[in-house]
Amino acid sequence: MSADDAPARLGDDRAQRSVVRRRAAFAVLTLVVLAGTVWYGVSELQRARAEQSAPSQVDVADGILDAPHVLFRSTAPGDLYGHAAAVALDDLSGPREVTSVVCDRVSSDGTTTVCLRTDRGVVTTYEAEVLDAAWRTTATWPLPGIPSRARLSPDGLVATTAFVTGHSYSQTGFSTETTVHRVDGTDVSGNLEDFTLLADGERVAPVDRNVWGVTFVDARHFYATVQSRSLGHTWLVRGDLEERTLVTVLDGVECPSLSPDGTRLAFKHDAAPAGSATAHWTPAVLDLASLEVTVLDAEERNVDDQITWLDDATLLYGLARDDEPETTDVWSLPADGTAPPEVAIPQAWSPSVVR
Amino acid sequence: MSGLVRAVPGDAGQPIRTAPEATPQTPEPRPPRRPDAARRRAGRVPSTVVTLGVVSFLTDVSSEAVTAILPLYVTAALGLSVVAYGVVDGLVQGAGALVRVAGGWVSDRTDRPKWVAAVGYGLSALTRVGLLFATGLPAIASLVVTDRVGKGVRTAPRDALIAAAANPRNLGRSFGVHRALDTAGAALGPLLAFAVLWAIPDGWTTIFVISLGAAVLGVGALVLLVPDLRPRQAAWLRAHRTRQDRGLPKCKGCTCDAPGAAALTAGGRPFSWSFLRGGATVRLLLVAGVLGLLTVGDGFVYLALQDRDGFATQWFPLLYVGTNAVYMLLAAPAGRLADRLGRARVLVWGHALLAGAYVCAAAPFSGAATTVTALVLLGAFYATTDGVLSALTSALVPTAVRGTAIGTAQTVTAVARMAASAGFGVLWYATGRVDALWIAAGALLVAVPVCAYLVRGGRLEPAAPAEETTA
């Protein structure tokens, strides 16, 4: 080639040295990052092993499941974390009977129990399980995503809500899948999103509708939430399993829960100022006869749970602890909002009242 | 001259030095020197492309590990509902698309794609530090948004870097190799995250630490190992120095000889939006838009499969891993195929595979066979379209506007696909899932031949300067 090759080669040499230096720097960086990550991972693994095998610090008693009780998911750290457990209805903060069943959400009527769980592994799957009074499995079916709500009706119907989540940048958001099964595992409804949605008598079909939070009225009717962000509504709907319809009742009602006497619905009311990106949910009660809403702002924290009625005058719901988020407490609040909330069952989640 | 060569070290030197062999209009026969070596080099994917693939691999391990467990983290560890998380996700879809064009534009204007990409990768890496300390949903939401902005910024300059480093003849294969590595990271990340949660039930922080480590290594690999390619400057050098080397007058009927040095420091031909007026570019964007409008999200295919049979429900969380695995395996071969048969042709006919996936999801045969076939077709669809689109675009437009053009083509596709998903959702509820899928498959089977006609006869293959006539 020509004479100007020489300076070019000189430049090449210098560039070559720079490349070697950069490669060495990258090798050092790799070593540092790997060593740091592995060290942290191993120490966390040891800590987790120690915590998991440590006995849970809870008072344990027998025979609670034979009397009226509240069944829940125990969130006391230690070897019993995540197990379904029960406390006596007349001594909520007292000792608990712990079962061998592990659940994310649990709902029970005393003879039948529904347990939604995450089967962790390299392949994480989710399932719903129905158990009989002796805690034997009678039916299971797969869930498409993270278990969120479970409700069992006295008529042998099971409503489950799972979050089907986006997994990649290209996917659009999330969706819920809410279905109703019979306790023997047969599918009654399919995805409730496929029911005909009637808003003020008109059939509407917003693309982004999601259905969740079923509460049963009887063997055929239920209440639930239907949300469509594009339409800007979060409706309370009354569903009909035979007609396969969802009829809107009221806007702004989320995650309803029917009172034992069937006259009121407890729900999450979004008290965040209009236009804010995130919701702030406050418990509220709707009188079904007058459609009058009482917002229970004695509870100032953000409550994200499907509320349960302890009795006709008291609500129960779970809240994570600020300082130890894996541990939750079940709180109680008078349904008329006249007194502040207090801890009903410490270290518990997903309460279900069995009378 | 040495200073100029140093500005484009390593692989960047390759195109310049090999330019006499690769420049098409060369009237003389090829220099007889080392023809075998040259051919072998042309068949190989440049190390810069592989390094960029490794950068993407690490970054995808980092981001997908977090993305996969974020809903669980928000619900299980923070005690919030995923409904709240959905809000976050919806907010950022549009913003990400616009940032893509901007990232390409800045990289073209500055002629520094590496550093624009580094800003994007760095931004995402910073959000991993944030995750270690974030506790509330607003904090996590803003981190997710920042991460997506980072992804938007880096994509177009990164693809411009690949285009600059690759041999124009095997551009498709280079993009394919990059996408294979990228997708491997996207598949590995979630598996890694779930493996950690399996071993450490509350191992969120461990996942975030691993994610941070992978992101830091990704940025480190980019900054330390990828040469600072200056595509515009290199193109200028290629055009001018080679003519000089060949003893030709520096320019043929142009005036660029006079301001030589000034033009060099400015980085060659300046950026101009006029590429958007070029007939071929418009045609490409039109085809990408039309096909994008018929590409409904994979989410719908998965949901349809899951509605139909229990097999898909049980493995629902894994369906996308299957798709990604196929995509990963086929990306490089599909890119090679595109180089041979024509990139536009492969891009267009790849959408027939998507129609096949819809048919599998709509067909009344439930069970593992149709589910697996649908996943294979989806993966093959991505392999024949994603990297190929970038390869096609970067070969079609002048070097000076490559980043912007790639960003624009990707944005057109992304926005069209978003619209498709919204529209398909309406159809899904109006006609039921089976009919909706048949309609989408039918529309695709009409659109594909039409688009194939639009791009017939190599209409979207590059004009002379970028492609070897003998290829």
Stretches with model-predicted labels:
Chain A
Residues 2-355:
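Sequence signature of WD/YWTD-type beta-propeller architectures
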